[in-house]
Amino acid sequence: MQGSVTEFLKPRLVDIEQVSSTHAKVTLEPLERGFGHTLGNALRRILLSSMPGCAVTEVEIDGVLHEYSTKEGVQEDILEILLNLKGLAVRVQGKDEVILTLNKSGIGPVTAADITHDGDVEIVKPQHVICHLTDENASISMRIKVRRGRGYVPASTRIHSEEDERPIGRLLVDACYSPVERIAYNVEAARVEQRTDLDKLVIEMETNGTIDPEEAIRRAATILAEQLEAFVDLRDVRQPEVKEEKPEFDPILLRPVDDLELTVRSANCLKAEAIHYIGDLVQRTEVELLKTPNLGKKSLTEIKDVLASRGLSLGMRLENWPPASIADE
């Protein structure tokens, strides 16, 4: 194998084995000896702790005041229902918080498919069981709050901060935002030409279905790369502040009057007076414009309205006008 002894091998993605929609194996090789465990452990920790996702954070169940109670006609107690709701896999588009509702009556299981939601929400596993109703006259109604977050946030950390505004009957749930349910990696031997001391990294992962396993690994690698950027050049710990030069004139003043989309009559009158830029126009007064041949009060009103819509007006004073970029034209 050619190359300097100080050069590192760059791994390539060898294979992605999609066991199911939520289960995949990803293989990368070749890696320098020891890098299999270095990268595998780093990616594993990020995948478990830093993947954003959605989770149930609060629940209100009709007739239930606290989590240590039971509900007539429901097989499970309230704690078990809350535990089942923690396993709800939800994908939310464009929102950080949504409220879902569930209303069910009659004997039978209550599943995620019974939840009512809008088009921004997708229930990934509609067959997920929440509880069982055991009586024909039994019913259950609940409001479920789902939030977007990262990592694991126990309900105990939110109890005191929300105590004053949390009404009786609103039950807090431990929020497990991570869409990754299981992650493991294995390092095997790899060979390139005459070198037999290399690593092969095999990552096996299962998700709750709200994220594709391949996309999850891609995001984790991006997070790791971004966190390591600061170590690339330690001399640049403090970035110099770049002072933005404030332009001498508002860019809109440097645009031609044609950009105002005036009527043909008004535009021709302005060009006849050598008014080519918006900066030229705003310095004129109403009296000056009314002296322009063929420009009447109707055209003047049009010009004033168009300028006002852009935060400008007639009679403005512009120091050092025109700028050199225009004066040289």
From Swiss-Prot:
InterPro entries: DNA-dir_RNA_pol_insert, DNA-dir_RNA_pol_RpoA/D/Rpb3, DNA-dir_RpoA, RBP11-like, RNAP_asu_C, RNApol_insert_sf
Lyase listed as a keyword: no
Annotated GO MF terms: DNA binding; DNA-directed RNA polymerase activity; protein dimerization activity
A cellular component annotation (GO) from this entry: cytoplasm
Catalytic activity, reaction form: RNA(n) + a ribonucleoside 5'-triphosphate = RNA(n+1) + diphosphate
Region (Alpha N-terminal domain (alpha-NTD)) residue spans: 1-235
Top-level taxon of the source organism: Bacteria
Subunit architecture: Homodimer. The RNAP catalytic core consists of 2 alpha, 1 beta, 1 beta' and 1 omega subunit. When a sigma factor is associated with the core the holoenzyme is formed, which can initiate transcription.
NCBIfam families in alphabetical order: PRK05182.1-2 (NF003513), PRK05182.2-5 (NF003519), rpoA (TIGR02027)
Record remark: domains: The N-terminal domain is essential for RNAP assembly and basal transcription, whereas the C-terminal domain is involved in interaction with transcriptional regulators and with upstream promoter elements.
UniProt-recorded name of the protein: DNA-directed RNA polymerase subunit alpha
Gene from which the chain derives: rpoA
